[in-house]
Every structure is written in C-alpha cells, then in structure tokens.
Amino acid sequence: MATRGKKEKEYPPMPANWMYKRGDVYMMDLNPYSGSEQGGVRPAIVVQNDDGNFYSNVLLVVPLTTQIKKRNMPTHFVLHNRFLSAPSMAICESPRPADKSRVLSYLGHLSKYEMRQVSVCLQYSF
C-alpha cells in the first residue's frame, strides 16, 4: 500500500539459510504497532545472542529512528553509518521481539565499539 504518493520499495526475499548475528542491522517491517511503539518500515539492530538468533524464529531488535530527539538520554545512541541513509538513533528503551518474516533486507553490521555502546544503553533499561 503506497502512502502520500510514495512508491513502496521492493525488497528481495532473505535467503532461507541466512545466519542472523548480534549487531546486524536490517530493514524491517514493524507494522502493525500499537500506541508509542516504533513501527513502520525502518532499520533495527539485532541485540539477541547468536544462539537465540539461530534456534528461534523471533529476533530481539532495537528499532532505529532518524528523528534525533533526547540524544542525552542514557538509553539513546546515535549511529552514523554508511549503510544507513541518515544519522539514526537507537531507541534502546524499546527493544522488541520481531519474527524473522519481518526482515526485508540486510543493511550492515555495527562495529564492536557501536555494539558496546548499544549494550550499555540497553543496561539502563533493565
């Protein structure tokens, strides 16, 4: 369904044997959503451990947003990556489960430094 005159981007299907890794960033369709949850088609970081990613059909992800607000919150971290279309903020207070069928495409993998920062932000949420 196109909205506001925008053409929806087509994504090739992910390979059935794809190995999802902690720190991977994927374009995901997080619809439907409710209330203040982050929804829509957006990038998200896989934060679940690799064993869980292998055995489960569900990933634990942190959504990203290009709306950079409250950047000083301890649960927010801004990413500047070549594989993201714009600077994007990890919203680490809102990790969520997402079925692998929601994955549209692989975008890239965070550096060790970036993933450490995301992990620190996640610790503030738990």
Where do the protein language model's features map onto the residues?
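Conserved functional hotspots at enzyme active or ligand-binding sites that engage polyanionic ligands
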Residues: M1-F126
